[in-house]
A protein has these predicted regions:
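Conserved ABC transporter NBD signature motif
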Residues: 56-71
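H-loop/switch region of ABC-family ATPase nucleotide-binding domains
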Residues: 189-191
């Protein structure tokens, strides 16, 4: 469970995060939506202890990320390509992630089989450094890196960016299948309302760092209210 209480962050006069209370329950697939500048990425960086809040707190399974490293073993995240070690090939990078997580190379190779369709023959076995991959294939490497350890909490910022239509559709299945198989909590931001509604069990709408809506999304029930909000 993730608990956010009175979390605040400003950059100068700009309010980037002002969340009084938000609880993300175990097993939620939470879609985070909002226009540019809504504070989605700022919230993710606060969750991952990449930014220090001006006030308030974040607890991941009752651990404050600013005070302990223990939460890192249970969280997988990909925000942008700055997370990647781009002078490695994808295989070298995944092997490194496996090693620091206590996985054997056999276990890493077995996990990678789950992503063969998503990789579409463009990531594995190409003998290319990550830095030389296309934006879409870097995105695939980042997403796989967040999932390969099978963490119980996954945070992905705009995962559908840079992906072609086929890869976007496959990714939706990858994420929903992962959630079903592991019971993990997924937190995903996206500008694509359709993809968000398709895969999320709950949708949170942010504007100027504030939670405007927190909608259950059974059978895409949040779609109409979200469309009405963004069309106003």
């Amino acid at each position: 469970m993730i608990t956010i209480s009175n979390l605040k962050k400003q950059f100068g006069e700009t309010v980037a995060c002002d969340i009084e209370q938000l609880t993300i329950n175990d097993g939620d697939i939470l879609g985070l939506v909002g226009n540019n500048g809504a504070g989605k990425t700022t919230l993710f960086r606060l969750l991952l202890d990449l930014l220090q809040p001006d006030g308030g707190s974040v607890l991941i399974d009752n651990i404050n990320p600013a005070q302990s490293e223990d939460w890192k073993q249970s969280v997988g995240a990909y925000i942008d390509e700055g997370f990647l070690i781009d002078f490695l090939t994808p295989e070298e990078y995944f092997a490194f992630l496996g090693k620091v997580s206590g996985m054997t190379q056999t276990e890493v190779d077995e996990r990678l089989k789950d992503f063969e369709q998503f990789a579409a023959g463009e990531v594995f076995g190409q003998k290319k450094l990550i830095r030389n991959l296309s934006a879409g294939n870097k995105q695939k490497v980042g997403i796989i890196s967040a999932l390969i350890r099978r963490p119980k909490t996954v945070i992905l910022d705009e995962p559908f960016n840079f992906l072609d239509p086929s890869s976007q559709l496959i990714l939706k299945h990858v994420l929903t299948d992962y959630a079903k198989e592991t019971g993990a909590t997924l937190i995903i931001s996206s500008h694509n309302l359709q993809h968000t509604v398709d895969i999320s069990t709950r949708v949170v709408l942010l504007e100027h760092g504030v939670v405007i809506r927190d909608l259950p999304n059974q059978d895409t029930s949040a779609a109409a209210e979200l469309e009405a909000y963004f069309e106003r």
